[in-house]
Amino acid sequence: MSYKVNSSYPDSIPPTEQPYMASQYKQDLQSNIAMATNSEQQRQQQQQQQQQQQQWINQPTAENSDLKEKMNCKNTLNEYIFDFLTKSSLKNTAAAFAQDAHLDRDKGQNPVDGPKSKENNGNQNTFSKVVDTPQGFLYEWWQIFWDIFNTSSSRGGSEFAQQYYQLVLQEQRQEQIYRSLAVHAARLQHDAERRGEYSNEDIDPMHLAAMMLGNPMAPAVQMRNVNMNPIPIPMVGNPIVNNFSIPPYNNANPTTGTTAVAPTAPPSGDFTNVGPTQNRSQNVTGWPVYNYPMQPTTENPVGNPCNNNTTNNTTNNKSPVNQPKSLKTMHSTDKPNNVPTSKSTRSRSATSKAKGKVKAGLVAKRRRKNNTATVSAGSTNAGSPNITTPGSTTSEPAMVGSRVNKTPRSDIATNFRNQAIIFGEEDIYSNSKSSPSLDGASPSALASKQPTKVRKNTKKASTSAFPVESTNKLGGNSVVTGKKRSPPNTRVSRRKSTPSVILNADATKDENNMLRTFSNTIAPNIHSAPPTKTANSLPFPGINLGSFNKPAVSSPLSSVTESCFDPESGKIAGKNGPKRAVNSKVSASSPLSIATPRSGDAQKQRSSKVPGNVVIKPPHGFSTTNLNITLKNSKIITSQNNTVSQELPNGGNILEAQVGNDSRSSKGNRNTLSTPEEKKPSSNNQGYDFDALKNSSSLLFPNQAYASNNRTPNENSNVADETSASTNSGDNDNTLIQPSSNVGTTLGPQQTSTNENQNVHSQNLKFGNIGMVEDQGPDYDLNLLDTNENDFNFINWEG
């Protein structure tokens, strides 16, 4: 009998094709167990993390009972604010504040001492302790805080607050000193332990300080090892130890067995007779580590401590060890005995300052007082000279070459000539050229760069580049001639503006009292006596610049060239070298460059050289420029160029510019200049207005001096009383009537001079709407022959 296997029954034997079923069940069971264990482990880890977080949160609360109060500091502040509002009789404000701040406190109830808690909407708030004061603790606290804050910040404060603050400072200083002594004692103990010499000694810092001071007091502890080598311990790096020697640990007598501390030399400090039981409220000054009061004075054998705050005149007391140099004080009345001082100090000119380096050494500098030289009108003190602007009543402070404009400068003529040397590109009397680095530099900027050199001997030769003729205080005349040296190649500082100086031949006859200046050939001596009038033997004296009634353009000139007229050949001889551009980074002080004698004998140059011309160039970048020039009795002869005829403003004849051969020479050269036929104006008040000079040519004027209506850009007409000065009929074509020395100002609009001694008035020439030439810079030549040094009153560029 056989049985068939039915696969439908689950408990039947599985076929041979499925042998893996049992093993699969086992794997599934194991995986389920593993997942269960992993989930349990993750749950345990999460629980542990949560417990750690709770412990970290709850641990500070358990350890610090005041942490909750600190965390609720805002609630504490709100309580004090509520208390202040309540005691200030601000009931409504207190109620509104309590409602907004969620304060569970009765509106009319005063705070009491102690915590108080109430329930509100299920929330329990623990209030901090509120101090009960009559006007509110917040108000009283604020009063005390503000008073002490003002005292500590040196803003005042009450007397009690100042006393309290001083007591606090004194306690802090004493604590600082004690801490420094404790650090020193600990260092000594550490060094002794390192050497094996420490035997459990306890060193009191105050006893150690007393031993350092040499006070006869018992040591802090019984010293052991009496046979110890008493050698001081050098400690490098400790400022306290470096300032005084350390006494031995035990200086005992082996025969007697007793310990006796040998007193050391008392240092200089504020701990005189300080013991452990004495009052330590001595006069301490703070900073005990670096300004330690116990510094030795081993040279004082007496044994008395020297206090730094007292005056000790004994010769044995010397300064402490390692005294810094910065602590040495010197009063203003203390003067060194061995330092030579000069009796008079004079600021040098721009050329003499560049002679060489100043010798090293301490030299007392004193300011020389100038009581006689008068620079500006109505001024009797030359300590701060002023330059009066023509046409105005205001005066400007003159920077006349002093270092910081503090030293009186009366040699204005020397300054002016130095200014001409610095601003001039070449010399019209010599072939030497100035330094390229000094082109466009002002003398005041150069003076500020070079230090003032003390004049040791006032009787020595002057370092000025020009002859000095002056009068001393006793009335004697002395002429001192010095040799000029060209300034070195030195970088100078930039200066925005430099006031110009108006120079007249005689400064004593200026009745208008507006311009007080000096001649080019006159320079006061070191005693600053009033200048004396001398005849100018130069055939072509230096052109004088005046102050501008409007600020000068700060841009530099493009270039400047000079030439000389040769009377033998009748030619204008140009100087060596091409035109040299002025440094564009240095602002020019005036739009006119002047060439003056630079080297050689001045007298020989006066007799051998003849006048030349000056090329005026407008500032760079100006397409339309108005050149406003005021001349005084001068003859203007230009080079041979194209001319432009202009109309007279009063409808007169046309003034024609003429070019011809020079009658003084038979050579037909194109550079030869000749004086044309004289054209006299129809009246003394005839004026000429030049309005459109369109090219780089110049006008050849007759050998006369004319005056024109000077129309400024503000359309102001400066009409002067013009006169004509014809030349002499002799062979000298360069002779002109010299103007009076009192010509120093430009007459205002519709105003004539009332000075009877004024022979020649200001000659006004206006060049308007000067055009630029394509591919060229503007080049306007004004050949000034036989001009007086007072010819130019002012020059104003406007664009």
UniProtKB/Swiss-Prot annotation:
Record field: compositional bias (Low complexity): 41-55, 307-317, 341-353
InterPro entries to which the protein is assigned, alphabetical: LisH
Compositional bias segments (type: Polar residues): 1-10, 270-285, 318-340, 371-396, 460-480, 584-593, 660-675
Annotated Basic residues bias: 354-370, 482-497
Main localization category: nucleus
GO cellular component: a single term: nucleus
Domain LisH positions: 73-105
Subcellular location: Nucleus
GO annotation terms (biological process): regulation of biosynthetic process
Region listing for Disordered, in residue ranges: 1-22, 37-68, 101-127, 255-406, 431-501, 568-621, 644-691, 705-758
Keywords on record: Activator, Nucleus, Transcription, Transcription regulation
Family of the protein in this entry: Belongs to the FLO8 family.
PANTHER family, sorted: LISH DOMAIN-CONTAINING PROTEIN, TRANSCRIPTION ACTIVATOR MSS11
Its biological purpose: Required for diploid filamentous growth, haploid invasive growth and flocculation. Putative transcriptional activator of FLO1.
Protein name listed in UniProt: Transcriptional activator FLO8
Protein's organism: Saccharomyces cerevisiae (strain YJM789)
Protein encoded by which gene: FLO8
